[in-house]
Amino acid sequence: MTNVPWLDACCASPLFRDLPRERTAALLEGRAELRSFSRGQDLDWYLRKLGIVTEGRLAVYNAGGTLLNQLHPGDMFGVSTVFTGYSSHITRISAAVNSAVVLIGEEELAAIFAEDFSVNRSYLAFLTDRIRFLNWKIDLFSASTAQQKLRLYLLHLRKEGSEVTVEPLARLGHTLGMGRASLYRVIEKLEGEGVIKRMERNRWQVDWERLCAE
């Protein structure tokens, strides 16, 4: 089983990336269901199953049809109904291109947790990251000015050092919920104040002390 092509994506997922490949293969033996689907096909059969994208790309939409996210090999989905009493999904997922996923049911996932606690810990860490991300999105939505939105976005990217990699500007405007003109104005303002410096491609240098003082 260690040579199956979809195992690479599972090993790259938040659930198994800290484990050796052989251990991941052993945990998934007899517990993973591989499903393939065509471009445009909706996923409506993964209730109470955790999914891992193994090939292609999935698109995630809200109830109104707005694109929320795109999932690539190694990304996970389906956590909103796993180990809960909910009988429906809060988003709609469809294949942006011909794709494949691995599905793990509740009972199988519980058995994996019982067999290897490190997977349980990784799952909890993934849920914590999701909560932090949702809180950030709420703060972003509540921000009243373009400058506040960009500030929150950059702080969300902050790691060690002064450099961050941002999204392409067209996508960044969509993420922040503002038009391109507004985005360019606030970028130029922060550049003029010495808060940020745009470098090659999508890399920016940020003066975190000045940004936090904004």
Model feature map: region roles:
Residues 114, 118-180:
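Polybasic "coupling" helices that flank or enter modular domains
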Residues 68-125:
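Cyclic-nucleotide recognition modules
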Residues 33, 42, 57-62, 76, ...:
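Short beta-strand segments in beta-sandwich/barrel cores
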Residues 48-64, 73-74:
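Glycine- and acidic-residue-biased ligand/ion/polar-headgroup-sensing regions
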Residues 30-31, 39-50, 64-66, 86-90:
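A short beta-loop-beta micro-motif enriched in histidine and acidic residues
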Residues 38, 54-55, 72, 97:
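A cytosolic small-molecule/anion-sensing beta-strand core signal
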Residues 153-214:
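Phosphate-/nucleic-acid-contacting segments
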Residues 1-39, 81-84:
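Cyclic nucleotide-binding regulatory module and flanking cytosolic helices
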